[in-house]
């Protein structure tokens, strides 16, 4: 995630991440803090690691079926709007890239999604799985955001 804020003193960002981390909830931490050089409108996509955990082991053929699901031309899920209503949203055009691998108990998805106008929360991949491949619904999902990218796939800074 990207947190855009202003400070009341001159700073290059050093030391701010450590100070912010002292007040963050468990599981959330600030990785870096730096001066904004570019406008937010140049932010294009988000890269995340999505881990699907299966207590009884990954179902046979799950990685291939999930790879096919994420490559579909249309992938409609129900998503809450800002008004808290449910709306059908096609997330397929918002998925830029998805690499799927697996071991015995986990499926790993290295995914790049559209970040804004509209943006896709990578956590919603779980909803797509539940809607289209309910037999592959994992016991637990972990999402770790890795990078925020510009239109050229470079780190947004």
Predicted feature locations:
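Ordered, amphipathic secondary-structure segments that act as subunit-interaction surfaces
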Residues: 1-51
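Residue-level recognition of well-ordered beta-strand positions that form the cores
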Residues: 4-6, 49-53, 99, 110-114
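Short amphipathic alpha-helices in soluble, non-transmembrane regions
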Residues: 13-24, 61-71, 124-129
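Short capping loops/turns at secondary-structure boundaries
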Residues: 41-43, 59, 118
């Amino acid at each position: 995630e990207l947190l855009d804020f202003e400070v009341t003193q001159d700073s290059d960002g050093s030391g701010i991440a450590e100070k912010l981390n002292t007040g963050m909830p468990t599981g959330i931490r600030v990785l870096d803090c730096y001066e904004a050089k570019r406008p937010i409108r140049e932010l294009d996509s988000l890269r995340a690691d999505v881990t699907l955990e299966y207590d009884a082991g990954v179902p046979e053929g799950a990685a291939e079926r999930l790879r096919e699901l994420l490559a579909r031309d249309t992938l409609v899920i129900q998503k809450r709007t800002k008004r808290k209503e449910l709306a059908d949203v096609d997330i397929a055009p918002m998925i830029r890239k998805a690499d799927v691998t697996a071991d015995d108990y986990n499926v790993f998805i290295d995914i790049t999604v559209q970040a804004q106008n509209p943006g896709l929360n990578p956590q919603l991949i779980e909803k797509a799985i539940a809607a289209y491949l309910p037999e592959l619904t994992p016991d637990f999902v972990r999402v770790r955001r890795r990078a925020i990218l510009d239109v050229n796939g470079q780190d947004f800074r």
